[in-house]
Amino acid sequence: MPNLKDLKNRIASVKSTRKITKAMQMVAAAKLRRAQEAAEMARPYAEKMEAVMSGLASAVGNSEGAPRLLAGNGKDQVHLLVVMTAERGLCGGFNSTIVRKARVHAQKLLGEGKTIKILTVGKKGREQLRRDYADHLIGHVDLSDVKRLGYADAASIATDVLNRFEEDEFDVATIFFNRFESVISQIPTATQIIPAVFEDVEEADDTSKDSGTLYEYEPSEEAVLEDLLPRGIATQIFTALLENGASEQGARMSAMDNATRNAGDMIDRLTIEYNRSRQAVITSELIEIISGAEAL
């Protein structure tokens, strides 16, 4: 049976840990509100941007003048994986789930005989992927000093990716991030950004026809799309960063809440054990006193 001093020290230690996890939970809750608002405010702009580009892509189709970012370079051999994770841990399975999704995709591509290159955003993803894919890592984006994500951060990443594409370093680019659903639900998501893919191209085209509105583009649809696509890619990356940021805070808030609850349960168990041990010591001392009195 543990002695009373050890139990008392353990209770004090767990109480101290509970204070830390509770404080982290409250900080994450405050950050989550801001991050969630930012993600929700960015969604309408991203959706409208995609709708505009989708309509243009439908009009341009596979014509000879189609932008390279839409048509691709005609190859599908080298794939760039942009994996977005957090700079810090203590957020449950937030980092591991997105890394797992990237790993599955990487293994699928390697199994098909293709080449992969990995660009990591966030320290935790780099640490995990370096164990198995060190030779495939080509770059890392450190956001540890960024207090509040801005469009400039996404534009910087987009510029790097676009430059690599222009230099024919890869053929296809996919971003991996967690899409925010709720505090307890973050969805690992993979989105191809180069060549640009629009799931609802036909639907968008039908909608524009049904509306009866005709648009004329100057100098041409191809030229407008050529100018919009880099901005669209930057917007996709920005949206992914915001979704990832909200997901991280939600995951951390949930993880710290669970840790606080577990610490409370442990304190209760240790307190019961302490009281039982103390009761046993007192009972033993009383027996010794009574035995001594009877001996006299």
From Swiss-Prot:
GO terms for molecular function: ATP binding; proton-transporting ATP synthase activity, rotational mechanism. This is ATP synthase gamma chain. GO terms for cellular component: plasma membrane; proton-transporting ATP synthase complex. Its main location: membrane. F-type ATPases have 2 components, CF(1) - the catalytic core - and CF(0) - the membrane proton channel. CF(1) has five subunits: alpha(3), beta(3), gamma(1), delta(1), epsilon(1). CF(0) has three main subunits: a, b and c. Signal peptide: none annotated. One of its GO terms (biological process) is proton motive force-driven plasma membrane ATP synthesis. It comes from Jannaschia sp. (strain CCS1). Produces ATP from ADP in the presence of a proton gradient across the membrane. The gamma chain is believed to be important in regulating ATPase activity and the flow of protons through the CF(0) complex. InterPro entries: ATP_synth_F1_ATPase_gsu (IPR035968), ATP_synth_F1_gsu (IPR000131), ATP_synth_F1_gsu_CS (IPR023632). Belongs to the ATPase gamma chain family. Disulfide bonds: none annotated. The gene is atpG.
